[in-house]
Amino acid sequence: MTAHDLLQQFFTHRIVASLRAATAEMAVQSARAVIAGGIRILEVPYTIPGAMRVIGDIRHQFADEVTVGIGDIPTVEIADRAIKANVQFATLPYDNPQVIEFCHKHRVLVIPGGATPCEVARLAERGLQLVRVFPVGSFGGATYVGHLRRTIPNLHLLAAGGIDLPQVPEYFQAGASVVAIGSGLFPSSAGHQPAMEQLTQRVRQLLALPRASLS
């Protein structure tokens, strides 16, 4: 699947589940639970213990059923390890030209982060089609996304950071093309079987929430 094809997956499914787990085993269990609920795009933060193994395990178990990426990568070295683990996309917390170029070279979809209008606009000027607004909850939430969309109307935005489940429709209404949800989805007790069943139900609730049309 090409980077362009992967980008279309984001625009089709529009929800990214960003895993939260204390161990690699819990991360894989949580991944199974959210996939059972209907999630089709998973982000594995590089800070999860054994993140590369988690990526490899999910890719092996679910093959083409789910798109798997690594989150918040700060260096080319970590990007290289993730690519060797068969990652499909990478998100960045900020603009990192070296990592962006490395991912492009290896045909991995890269979604860099920006916060201020200036940062987001500079990424758009360099041809990035999807920019991660992070941490969006600290910059005004859905209202801020709406401001960015009015300022830079032709750019697709992925809202991430500090989003709770009930807030998701607000972000779509404000103009976000994609919403990533992490701590707002994964309970602190994730890793225990009852919590896994609850997690699957929470995902179903999430996917049933209304979404404004992609523009």
Task: Place the predicted regions along the sequence by residue.
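Conserved N-terminal beta1-alpha1 strand-loop-helix module at the mouth
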Residues: 1-86, 105, 154, 165-166, ...
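Residue-level detector of anion-binding/catalytic polar loops
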Residues: 40-41, 88, 109, 129, ...
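Histidine/lysine/aspartate-rich catalytic loop segments that bind and position anionic ligands
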Residues: 93-139
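Glycine-rich phosphate-binding active-site loops on the catalytic face of alpha/beta enzymes
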Residues: 89-99, 132-141, 175-196
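A charged, well-structured terminal subsegment
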Residues: 139, 145-151, 200
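A contiguous pocket-lining binding segment that forms or flanks enzyme active sites
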Residues: 127-132, 144, 153-154
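Glycine-rich beta-to-alpha transition loops that act as phosphate-gripper elements at the mouths
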Residues: 20-21, 70-76, 92-95, 112-117, ...
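Short acidic active-site motifs
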Residues: 26, 54, 77-78, 98-99, ...
